[in-house]
Amino acid sequence: MKEIVLASSSPRRRDLLKQLGLTFRIMTAGVDETPPGGLTPAEMVEVLAGRKAAAVAGMLEDALVIGADTVVVLNGRVLGKPADREEAAGMLRQLQGTDHTVYTGVAVMDAASKKMQVAHEKTRVFFKSLDEHEIRRYVATGEPMGKAGAYAVQGRAAAFIKGLEGCYTNVVGLPLARLADMLKKFGYNVL
């Protein structure tokens, strides 16, 4: 079977791939993560996932490269990763007491043939109401930094989640069922 390469330095994506029992290595490439204008959130994450996979695949002769990108969307506005703690707190103030949608784009590219599959998953997340003290304490943990929407569903923010509609691993950053189906189309069975 072909080597699997994860085009991401995300510890969460690494851990999710390990859950599938896959043997893989991690490689990243400097990719412009500025999406072209005028795209829907689904199109945006697919484009960025494809860029990441293609950039790493271009450095390899023969491997299946996985790229991914995740955003949180609230009332039509995309919330990416917060730049600082104040922005993280602001995002959490917006998300508290509402529901929002998490989109993750996934791309799998065969470095040898240059064939690529791109897809996305979306999950609806319901947040409970939070007070300012809870938001400040959570931000002080540092956990919101580097995460779309300023929260980690698999971490302390699990206490904020009332429910989900859709794929849990999508909210973590990599929809495993979707990825397994994509890999299968390249002849790679995870089981």
From Swiss-Prot:
Residues flagged as site, Important for substrate specificity: 12, 70, 154
Pfam families: Maf
Cofactor requirements of the protein: a divalent metal cation
DNA-binding as UniProt keyword: no
Subcellular location: Cytoplasm
Active-site residues (renumbered): 69
Gene3D superfamilies: 3.90.950.10
EC numbers for this chain: 3.6.1.9
Broad enzyme group: hydrolase
GO cellular component, one term: cytoplasm
Keywords of the record: Cytoplasm, Hydrolase, Nucleotide metabolism
GO molecular function, a single term: UTP diphosphatase activity
GO biological process, one term: nucleotide metabolic process
Family: Belongs to the Maf family. YhdE subfamily.
Function: Nucleoside triphosphate pyrophosphatase that hydrolyzes dTTP and UTP. May have a dual role in cell division arrest and in preventing the incorporation of modified nucleotides into cellular nucleic acids.
Name this polypeptide is given: dTTP/UTP pyrophosphatase
Organism: Pelotomaculum thermopropionicum (strain DSM 13744 / JCM 10971 / SI)
